[in-house]
Amino acid sequence: MSTVNQSSTRSELAGNWERLRKSCDTCQEAKVKCSQHKPSCHRCLRHRQPCVYSPQRRSGRPPKRPSPSSRLGPESNNSGDDIHNENTIQRTNLNANDSAMTDAGAVDPRVLTGDFAASTGIDPVDDIFQTSFESFLAASLSPKGGLLPGSHSNPTTPNGFSMNSPSITDPFGAFPFLITDHNLPIAALSSHVPPIDQLPVLSTGASNTSSECGDCGAKCYSSLLQHLLFLRQTLPESTRPSIDVIMQAEGHVRALLDRVLGCNACLGNRSSILLISAITERIVQMLDWIIEEKTLLDTENMRYNRRTFSSWGRPPRLPPHGLNGMRRNVCHVSLRVGNTELDEDAKQYFLKNFILLRLKKLAVKVQEVRRTATTRPGDCIYRAAELVLADSIQRLDYLRGQCQLWE
């Protein structure tokens, strides 16, 4: 008799094993045939995705989740065994150990007694974490929710629980993130930002000696940020400013480089070196605008007149031979000294030497900053700044050569 029972038990186990799902989780979810190769099936290898086998899950479609109406209570046509099982589960939950009851002491009493399911329609066993958490997020992200700062003095959860109630000791202890209110007004910056049409002013009392400027309180770094903001807002690439504005910005940058080179704290700052390289590149680009326009005008005049001709002079009353009825090209970049705009005759006397002198002074300062950046070749920030500064120096040498070709 025992032999018959053992054979039947083995046959039942074999039958149960046959009913267990043998395909991987990915193929089961996609409802496709699985090759059942381990450690990875053919489909998972082809799609380059992880292949996970869960042999304890039975084959067939998963059971349907009960509707909210069925969660309110047992139906009238339930069998006696189901009612008995539910009563057993309830008695088991009520007779839990003291540690579990201590952990559940912070939860609302309606969750433990079953009134929570009757009032909200949510199963406290299956969906207390999922559905309540989703509804909690939906209510907290709305502007009228009680979880945002400044909206209510006594915030509440979506289910009407008071967050200051003694039944909930730490409402945000389980959430490792903070929900901010994007509708709140942003506080104004305390620091003064100069107008965009005004150059940032350097403090006159600043010294270039490292002993006096050893601890500048980040004033040099603030000046770099202000000047970068000035170049970004006032001198966009779409509009080319006048020569005097460019020269004024170039002189201010050289004074700023002197200040940073004399401050050991700011000179050793990685961010300061990177800001200096960005500002220098911008100034070199603006100087290129002047020389590029002048060079193009000279080239066009040479093409028209077939001889070297300076485009900085005022056009004569009579047009040259071969240009009858055509207007000569002149430099349209304005040059102002104070509030007085110089004419074409006054420009040609000193503009060439003036620009050459400024290019030489700027190249010397940029070369000093580059030598400082090469002291840390292993630092990626210093390496990037050194490459930008090297390109700026090369560009300044090219501009000096182009400017010397002027007549």
Swiss-Prot record:
Coiled coil: none annotated. Disruption phenotype: Strongly diminishes the production of asperlin. Residues 23-53 bind DNA. Pfam families: Zn_clus. One of its GO terms (cellular component) is nucleus. GO terms for molecular function: DNA binding; DNA-binding transcription factor activity, RNA polymerase II-specific; zinc ion binding. Transmembrane segments: none annotated. Residues 53-85 are annotated as: Disordered. Its main location: nucleus. Residues 75-85 have a biased composition (Polar residues). SUPFAM superfamilies: Zn2/Cys6 DNA-binding domain (SSF57701). PANTHER family: OLEATE-ACTIVATED TRANSCRIPTION FACTOR 1-RELATED, TRANSCRIPTIONAL REGULATOR ALNR. Transcriptional regulator involved in the positive regulation of the expression of the gene cluster that mediates the biosynthesis of asperlin, a polyketide showing anti-inflammatory, antitumor and antibiotic activities. This is Transcriptional regulator alnR. It comes from Emericella nidulans (strain FGSC A4 / ATCC 38163 / CBS 112.46 / NRRL 194 / M139).
